[in-house]
């Protein structure tokens, strides 16, 4: 066992593979991971509700009032209006979606952080880990946020 360990650090080509693996592991442990973010454009407006309704009408979309939960800070502070369009097949990693969660009776706005065979895994921007119980499928998907209007 000790001879194999010594060979892993000294004998060519094993030492190269060992050092590459150690550097990769160190990189994963000590370099902060930044998730993919595809933020919608944020527009300041004197009357954000009217501006959002006008944009939604032009895009054939829908307007959602954003509540003050803090789960999507700093993108969404609360009090804004989000404009969504329905395009489930085109959803991409990092986009902000509106959906009906099975654990909550009101629509939720969170970011798509991963996809598996059960749908999109969602999480708020302030969450340390994904909220694995929240999955978005075509059945509970309400829209992709394309614009946010807030009071200036």
Regions found by a protein language model. Name each.
Residues 69, 114-116, 143:
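A residue-level detector for short acidic-glycine micro-motifs
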Residues 84-85, 100, 144:
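Residue-level recognition of conserved beta-strand edge/terminus positions
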Residues 88-101:
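Short coil-to-beta transition motif at edge beta-strands of beta-rich domains
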Residues 119-152:
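Extended, hydrophilic extramembrane loops/domains of integral membrane proteins
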